[in-house]
Curated annotation (Swiss-Prot):
Glycans are attached at residues 15, 118, 196, 336. It comes from Caenorhabditis elegans. This is Putative N(4)-(beta-N-acetylglucosaminyl)-L-asparaginase. Transmembrane segments: none annotated. GO terms for molecular function: N4-(beta-N-acetylglucosaminyl)-L-asparaginase activity; peptidase activity. Belongs to the Ntn-hydrolase family. Its EC number is 3.5.1.26. SUPFAM superfamilies: N-terminal nucleophile aminohydrolases (Ntn hydrolases). GO terms for biological process: proteolysis.
């Protein structure tokens, strides 16, 4: 049976463009209460201090609230039980970018990323060196673990370290904990692929296991900012960095619009979905179709991939698309503080490409 998926564009328009009285405007991934609060704080802060202040305040809200335990401290520990943070902030005016990845023992990842933008000529700082940079700026060093994360690790180890992110090692990572040793490469592995690539995309994305807030801000001057904050994949190999802090992967913005992504970051970062969605909007594609194209080009290679993209263009139109998630919610906020949460059905592995060739447009 054929299934069709609708991409909603429910937003106040006047003669095809958004009413300027609605600006600033913010769109964020995920529809839970913490994300709604972050969305409202972002639009309020944008009115007070501009698009970058609004972006950072919104992301920082989710960090403090530990949104769905997938943002901020006390979530998604690595194999060693340590929680590390990633964040990205982008200002479309001048393409200014700051990011941190694998940030240890500092809670304020988004503010540190903003510090990279404002106080260095770099784009991305990583690991312990990023922590030292944060301390130079006056950020407090503290343990990001909680009793809950410690219990997760304990349970994970008693369940033979399942799931994990190892492959082609011994003992069998699908049934045993490490330490692991690499298996000898066969001839076919050397010349073709270490594993069937479809096995690389099986990271289940859901409400408590999605790892990211992605946000796009459009200010009163119609200029965009965009960013992310994340504590990464749960039980990841220490040192792992996903899509969230990578410009064009986790988020992207220019004068034509902005986009943000969430989901299986190890796969998504290979396709730069946020950059792709924005460039599609630059070519005149509506946000819903731009997000849809960004998702389906990943599904063509990784049918089991799960994730989502939200997008907003310079006319104030919004759109979203998702794959292999039961339901994906996202928020839109306006100048008056109203936050509207939408929920869309997602493309599925078994039928996403066979029948549906393009998103259904509204408005």
């Amino acid at each position: 049976m054929r299934r069709f998926y609708i991409f909603l564009l429910l937003i106040p328009y006047i003669n095809g463009t958004i009413n300027d009285d609605s600006l600033p405007m913010v769109i964020t991934t995920w529809g839970s209460d913490g994300f709604k609060k972050a969305t409202k704080n972002a639009v309020d802060a944008t009115l007070l201090g501009g698009r970058m202040f609004g972006l950072v305040e919104g992301l920082s809200t989710c960090e403090a609230l530990q949104c769905d335990t997938t943002v901020g401290y006390g979530g998604s520990p690595d194999e060693n039980g340590e929680t590390c943070l990633d964040s990205l902030v982008i200002d479309a005016d001048g393409m200014r970018v700051g990011a941190v990845a694998n940030l240890h023992r500092i809670r304020d990842a988004a503010r540190v990323a903003w510090g990279v933008m404002n106080f260095t000529k770099h784009t991305l700082l990583v690991g312990e060196s990023a922590t030292q940079f944060a301390k130079t700026l006056g950020f407090k060093e503290e343990d990001l673990s909680t009793e809950e994360t410690k219990s997760w690790i304990s349970k994970w180890k008693t369940e033979k370290c399942q799931p994990n992110f190892w492959k082609n090692v011994s003992p069998d990572p699908s049934s045993s904990c490490g330490p692991y040793k690499t298996n000898p490469l066969t001839k076919s592995m050397r010349y073709y692929s270490l594993v069937n690539q479809s096995d690389e995309a099986g990271y289940l994305v859901e409400k408590t296991n999605h790892d990211t807030i992605g946000m796009v801000v459009r200010d009163t001057e119609n200029i965009f900012s965009a960013g992310t904050s994340s504590n990464g994949a749960r039980f990841k190999i220490p040192g792992r960095v996903g899509d969230s802090p990578i410009p064009g992967a986790g988020a992207y913005a220019n004068k034509f619009g902005g986009a943000a992504a969430t989901g299986d970051g190890d796969v998504m970062m290979r396709f730069l979905p946020s950059f792709f969605a924005v460039t599609q909007m630059e070519l005149g594609t509506k946000p819903s179709k731009a997000a849809y194209k960004a998702i389906t080009r990943i599904l063509k290679v990784f049918p089991k991939f799960s994730g989502a993209v939200v997008a907003m263009n310079v006319k104030g139109r919004i759109g979203a698309s998702c794959a292999n998630i039961n339901k994906f919610g996202y928020n839109v906020a306006f100048q008056n503080g109203t936050v509207v949460t939408y929920s869309i059905s997602c493309l599925k592995e078994v039928n996403s490409l066979k029948y549906l060739k393009e998103g259904i447009e509204f408005a």
